[in-house]
Amino acid sequence: MRLSRTFLATLLLSPLVPIAARAQDLGIDVGAKAPAVSVQSLDGKRVSLGDYIGKTPMLIEFWATWCPNCKELMPTLLDAEKKFGKQVKFVAIAVAINQSPEKVRRWLAAHPLPHDTFYDVEGKAAGAFDAPATSYVVVLDKTGKVVYTGLGGKQDLEGAIRKAL
């Protein structure tokens, strides 16, 4: 009976191995040139990420007010911004899933952030960066090349930023 339980567990879990291995490969390719897509400011004005890309190293986080991984990542993100904020442009892109610009504005009023926050109304930025989920971080070097992508509440943002400097 013991062998059959082990066999059954292996059989049930083996399809998950490729998914776990592929998790690090999700998103825009490291080495790719970042797309200069447009997003919106929280007051509805069109903003092109191309205005920032290629001018200075940049950290972009795709996030949501309701995302637990984003909340877990926030202290690490703020520490990195405090340390590297004069050298790196930090940008948050709020995804348009279960939140509105108004909800994001209310959240930011209660939890002020030191960096620019934009809204991805049509999901074009998330699509262009192939963002697999919220808490997805992309770090660009000063030429606009992707040097890091990561997902989840525990990321080495300081190490990622050092790759861009």
Name each model-derived stretch:
Residues 28, 41-42, 140-141:
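Short, acidic, Ser/Thr-enriched surface-loop or helix-capping motifs
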Residues 37-58:
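A short beta-strand-turn-helix
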Residues 59-60, 90, 137:
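Hydrophobic beta-strand anchors of alpha/beta hydrolase catalytic cores
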Residues 71-111, 121-128:
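Structural microenvironment flanking redox-active thiols in thiol-disulfide oxidoreductases
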Residues 56-58, 62-66, 133:
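Short pre-active-site segment immediately N-terminal to redox-active cysteine/selenocysteine motifs
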Residues 54, 107-114, 120-164:
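Thiol/disulfide oxidoreductase modules built on the thioredoxin-like
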Residues 1-11:
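Bacterial N-terminal signal peptides that target proteins for export
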Residues 10-36, 106:
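N-proximal helix/coil linker or "cap" segments that precede and/or mark the start of modular domains
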